[in-house]
Amino acid sequence: MSEQAARRTRALSCWRGPVEPRPLGGGISNHNFLVEDGERFFVRIGEDFPVHNVLRRFELAASRAAHAAGIAPEVVHAEPGAMVFRYVEGRTLAPEDLRTETMLERVVPLVRTAHEAIPRHFRGPAPIFWVFQVLRDYAARLAAVGHRLAAGLPRYMAAAERLERMVGPIDIVFGHNDLLAANLIDDGRRLWLVDWEYGGFNSPLFDLGGLASNNELSPALEDRLLELYFETPVTDDLRRRYQAMKCASLLREAMWSMVSEIHLTIEFDYQAYTAENLDRFERAYATLANP
C-alpha cells in the first residue's frame, strides 16, 4: 500500500516536474510523504474511513479553516484522497515534551485559538464529534463482526453511559479531537497544530482530556492545563467533568484501535495499541468517584 500511495503522490497534478516522494513516519491511519518540487511539501494520502467517521471533505475544510485561523500550514492542492500542504520545518513533539508547564503555556493558547477561531473560517457543512456517539457506533461495528474482545463491549458501553452523564451539559467549540503530541510541530518560533481528520464541533473538555491522556500528564499538570484554558481556579465540578471526558477519550482511543485491527492496512501493531489504551482506560476509570 505504501508504494501505491507513493505512485499516487508522484501522479498528483500540482507538480511542476517529476518528483520522488520520501516516506515520513508517524502516521497510523494515512500515508505521509515529503516532496521537493522547488520547495518542500507535505503530502497526505488517505481515503474516507467511514468506520472511523472520517470524511476527507471535512478534513480539507477544517485544514483550510485552521490555516486561515493562523494555526496550521496552508493547503496548496487537494484531490480526492490526497492533500498537499506547505511543509513546516520543525520538530514534531513527543509526549514528554508536553509534560512541562512551560510547554502547556504554549500549547493551550493554540488550542483555544482553534476552538474559537476555526468556526469563523470553516465553510460548508460542518461535522460534530461527540465521543459517546462514536463509542456507540464502534461498539455496534465490533459486535457485528465478532471482534476478539466483543465480550467486553457491554461493560465498556455501560461505562460510557455513566461517563456521558458525568460530563453533563457542555459548551460547544470546534475541536481538533486527536491531540497527540505528534500533531504538534515546533518550528523554533511557534507551534503548529496539524492533522484535522477528526476535527469537528465538540466540548473543549474532549481536547483537554485527550491532551492529558495522550501525553500522560501528571495530576498537577492537569490542573494547570484546566487553569490555563479556563483562566480560573479549578473547581471540583470542573475537575470531575474533565476526568469523565478524559476517560471517554481513552476508551475511544482503545476502541478506535479495536476497529482499526479489522479495517486498516497500515503496518502498525494495532492489537498492542488496543491493549495499551484499554489498560490506561481501566486505570483512569478506576480512579473516578461514584457520580
Model region roles, listed by residue range:
Residues 240, 244-247:
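Start-of-helix signal in alpha-solenoid helical-repeat scaffolds, especially tetratricopeptide repeats
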